[in-house]
Amino acid sequence: MLKSNKVVLIGAGGVGSSFAYALTIDNSLVHELVIIDVNENKAKGEVMDLNHGQMFLKKNINVLFGTYKDCINADIVVITAGLNQKPSETRLDLVDKNSEIFKDIITNVVSSGFDGIFVIASNPVDIMTYVTMKYSKFPIHKVIGTGTILDTSRLRYFLSDRLNVNTQNIHSYIMGEHGDSSFATWDETKIAMKPLSEYLAEGKITEIELDEIHKKVVNAAYEVIKLKGATYYAIGLGIKNIVNAIIGDQNIILPISSYINGQYGGLVKDIYIGAPAIVCKEGVKEVLNFKISPKELEKFNSSANQLKSYIDKIEF
């Protein structure tokens, strides 16, 4: 059960600050946002900057600088802290360093008495979500990662741009790792009620174009990092959607880092990976186990095995 509609953000860098900004301008439910960062001046500066815009908000939110002690009565702790991906680095290159950072963060949060829901956005997010579950010993439904929510948004944007259809009417997901081994669920994709396969049959789009769209999704982060140094606006909006789904008990389906233990063919077990799930006030209500094609199932297993190979090297 929700306690106080209070969210604690750990990490006041580009992603954390973008989430905080998105939450303040589109907030109807959160009463308090506490920001924590190892760089206390950065956190204090973000708090001041956000509070100075209160006059322009539809609903005020109490934004505060805090410490780990403030987690005790929070409903949600959002973690964006950790080292960022550099040009030419993959997200998986960050495993060792960010695992050590997380061990300290999770220990401090749990020691405060926090018993709410973790939302993880730090990369590699699927592995960091698993790390959070292991270090916190929290139930799996109370540990959520952003997963492929950003990848899915990118996919729908690129497909909507190609077909000239609003993104809200495109029903498709990116599944698997939030990274290079992800895949698009093209065989299940629909534009409103019309299967994508009919668009292909009518010659309105080609298989080659779909492959190019998926490549653009996979390479999007590298491109943005090359151009501006980091990605943060879009993922900030994605985190805000997850938080609102929890606080608002929305029962919305989101492609998050979900705990998989036998779904999708039974081969993938004990791992967090991008898959659609129902998100509500309790965290994850259900991981959807919908039917995907054999080709996509093979990609799902391959992506999971890659993540597993990194997780198995971490000492818990």
UniProtKB/Swiss-Prot annotation:
One of its GO terms (cellular component) is cytoplasm. Pathway: Fermentation; pyruvate fermentation to lactate; (S)-lactate from pyruvate: step 1/1. Pfam families: Ldh_1_C, Ldh_1_N. GO terms for molecular function: L-lactate dehydrogenase activity. Its EC number is 1.1.1.27. Substrate binds at Q85, R91, N123, P124, V125, D126, D151, T152, S153, R154, T231. Belongs to the LDH/MDH superfamily. LDH family. Homotetramer. This is L-lactate dehydrogenase. It comes from Borrelia garinii subsp. bavariensis (strain ATCC BAA-2496 / DSM 23469 / PBi). The gene is ldh.
